[in-house]
Amino acid sequence: MPMAPKTLQNLKSAFHAETGVYFKYTLWADRARKAGHHAVGTLFDQVARNEWAHAKIWYKRLNQEMDTQEALLAAAGGEHHEWSEMYAQWADEARDEGELAAEKLFRQVAAIEADHEGKFRRMAQQLANGEEFQSAQPVKWVCANCGYLHEGAQPPEICPVCEHPQGYFARQ
């Protein structure tokens, strides 16, 4: 049975609010520590973890669980929107208002978001083709845990340095 529209909107709002607060508290924890207030930083971190847990609750209620392929394609779509519409519009508006520094930043971040879209789409294609850990020609693979570098058509099944499984390797 579909969820009532107001409840659905409230769940979405709760999810976005909790993720925003999580991020804000994490930043404030770092600032507090840099100012010498370690107990305050710890408090912000503890509450931030609670906010993250709350966000996960709302996300699950929204039935947003996706398989990896779906998540990669959804992420690519979100990144596409960010660079091609959102940041492009904001950059134009900043330029029109004479805020050239903000325009430049919006355009620079848009370029990064376009790169993110490409990375998500390439990984989705590799998964779809069964090529996540296979390359037609030798490439460099890096272990995300310890940084071990391996060159070959595929990464080792187990990292020889930290013994993490192949799933920790990505093309460099």
Question: Residues of each region from the PLM?
Answer:
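Non-heme di-metal
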Residues: 1-172
